[in-house]
Amino acid sequence: MAKKLVGSMKLQVPAGQANPSPPVGPALGQRGINIMEFCKAFNAKTADMEQGAPCPTVITYYQDKSFTMDIKTPPASYYLKKAAKLSSGAKTPSREVVGYVSSKQVREIAEAKMKDLNATSIEAAMKIILGSARSMGIEVK
């Protein structure tokens, strides 16, 4: 018989740095998920990613206290800030330009994000990344 689904939740956890402290521990604990088991599994799955990169994670948990997790690639904003060497985006993106990225960097970001984007071609994925860059006040040269 199939496991009975109880619910799902979304967390953004730094790659390779999941630990039982807040916000991860309490969020999992109140749903009855084994916190240490999650931390070990998450850190093992994200070992090959850049340490500290924020990873959006969808955790589906079942009645028997088991869980599955779907780890996505870091957000486009993380990659864009890293490429432009910024700490944050523009306060007024339509009027202020805070950094620049090359079209080659946009292509690399689109290739890295391709599996999580709703795009069929690399060009469509690049347009999505360009929109994110524009909304952050980052210009493409």
UniProtKB/Swiss-Prot annotation:
It comes from Roseobacter denitrificans (strain ATCC 33942 / OCh 114). GO terms for cellular component: cytosolic large ribosomal subunit. One of its GO terms (molecular function) is structural constituent of ribosome. It comes from the Bacteria. This is Large ribosomal subunit protein uL11. Forms part of the ribosomal stalk which helps the ribosome interact with GTP-bound translation factors. NCBIfam families: L11_bact (TIGR01632). One or more lysine residues are methylated.
